[in-house]
Amino acid sequence: MAGALCVTLLLLLSTNTVSGRKTWRRRGQQIVPSGRERSEGGDESFPLDFTAVEGNMDNFMAQIKSLAQSLYPCSAQRLDDEMKLHILHNKSVTCNDGSSAGYYLKESKGSRRWLVFLEGGWYCISHENCDLRYDTMRRLMSSKAWPPAKTASGILSTQPEENPHWWNANMVFIPYCSSDVWSGASPKTEKSGYAFMGSLIIQEVVKELLGKGLDAAKVLLLAGSSAGGTGVLLNVDLVADLLEELGYPGIQVRGLSDSGWFLDNKQYRRTDCTDIITCAPTEAIQRGIRYWSSMVPERCKQQFKEGEEWNCFFGYKIYPTLRSPVFVVQWLFDEAQLTVDNVHLSGQPVQESQWLYIQNLGRELRNTLKDVGASFAPACLAHEVITRSHWTEIQVRGTSLPRALHCWDRRLQETNKNSKVPLKGCPFHLMDSCPWPQCNPTCPSIRDHFTGQEMSVVQFLMHLGFDVQKMASQQGMEPGKLLGVLSS
């Protein structure tokens, strides 16, 4: 609120400097902040008495100066954007290497909404590839080098222009240091050499946040990207149950899963499970769930035979068992899915069989999302989106992701969980129907792996072997227009 008022003050000051002799005609009016500028906690507004302005500019300027002095200095606004690191008080809940886990927090006084974000970053499924991960990506296995503060973007941004509906929430970022898709519950032992406590880390953070204002929360949105997105599906009901057990049943727990809705499909080319990148999704999770001593939600676990709990790591299998509302954000042509399926789009144009595999992947993913009440699925080749600064630019059928989330939020306020009946002009079940990667004109730009140059949609599709020029010529239109027509 202070930031918006600072801008207002500067505009008022500059206006009155130029036109100091102008007489105000409106009387008895006040400047009232817009809905965006008001905090949801009902923060006090700062009225200006325009009745004293007419014929007395000195009085008006005195009010402006008094108001300005009562606000936080404009020059220091950006300093408050940082999230501060908090190491967990419970030292038994640790990262892979035994160092204490923690979280970053940016409080928003007066807000009763909390956004808790789970970071992504693959996983490791054996002592050998965990050792390699520790050598090359130690930040994802240890808290020892975490900075004392960090800034965030996308849905974690505190700037209204970048984060229209959640900018004023209490922001929590939980770094990923358990390498277990946020599912583990096993401490470090001499035999294993590593701890896998992802699920316990989430629980411990939630407990600590209760003492920092979460106890008065109205809504807790558990969000995550990639492995964090899958972590949301695995933990959202667990968090809801935990809060209820601790005596806070009134906190509405919801989930937002970004790029964590993977398919257990057959790879394009079958390879041995020698590393996590080429290992088939089902085999990787089957190995991992044993190695991590994973916690799987009981309601999902009951749907499968003993030893087949790994099925719960796949979104379309666990989603029907969830009691908490979940919004699913998923690219129809997710780069991580294509990677584990051994589909490589760099180098020479793809073969026909590969092209057909890619198209079929989009169809399969679309089918798994058709019964998901709240979803946003653009036909793009990308991975992760909600923490990207450009997340407001992606659209499906003319609706942006922040807008769809806001519509979902409004629907939940009416207590119609997972309803696909949209509010008038406010949809939240959105999927592209066009059949190939990047056919949505709002997709993030992609770059040539070798030259680093940005590729247009037409160039990319031609690279894949799709003759855009020929098809456009047959239709008597420009390639760009053809893509727009097909996308809409």
Swiss-Prot record:
Gene Ontology molecular functions: palmitoleyl hydrolase activity; protein-containing complex destabilizing activity
Classification via PANTHER family: NOTUM-RELATED (PTHR21562), PALMITOLEOYL-PROTEIN CARBOXYLESTERASE NOTUM (PTHR21562:SF7)
Active-site residues, Swiss-Prot/TrEMBL: S226, D334, H383
Biological role: Carboxylesterase that acts as a key negative regulator of the Wnt signaling pathway by specifically mediating depalmitoleoylation of WNT proteins. Serine palmitoleoylation of WNT proteins is required for efficient binding to frizzled receptors. Functions in the prospective ectoderm and is required for neural induction.
The EC number(s) this enzyme carries: 3.1.1.98
Tissues in which the protein is found: Expressed in the egg and through cleavage to gastrulation stages. Enriched in the animal (prospective ectoderm) and dorsal regions in early gastrula. Shows a dynamic expression during embryogenesis, in particular during neural induction and antero-posterior (AP) patterning.
Cellular localization per UniProt: Secreted
One Gene Ontology CC term in the entry: extracellular region
Name of one Pfam family that matches: PAE
Catalytic activity from the UniProt record: [Wnt protein]-O-(9Z)-hexadecenoyl-L-serine + H2O = [Wnt protein]-L-serine + (9Z)-hexadecenoate + H(+)
Superkingdom field: Eukaryota
Chief place where the protein resides: secreted
Gene from which this protein is expressed: notum1
Homology family: Belongs to the pectinacetylesterase family. Notum subfamily.
Glycosylation sites: N90
GO BP, sorted A to Z: negative regulation of canonical Wnt signaling pathway; negative regulation of Wnt signaling pathway; Wnt signaling pathway
Protein name from the UniProt record: Palmitoleoyl-protein carboxylesterase notum1
Alphabetically ordered keywords of this record: Glycoprotein, Hydrolase, Secreted, Serine esterase, Signal, Wnt signaling pathway
Secretion signal, residue range per the UniProt entry: 1-20
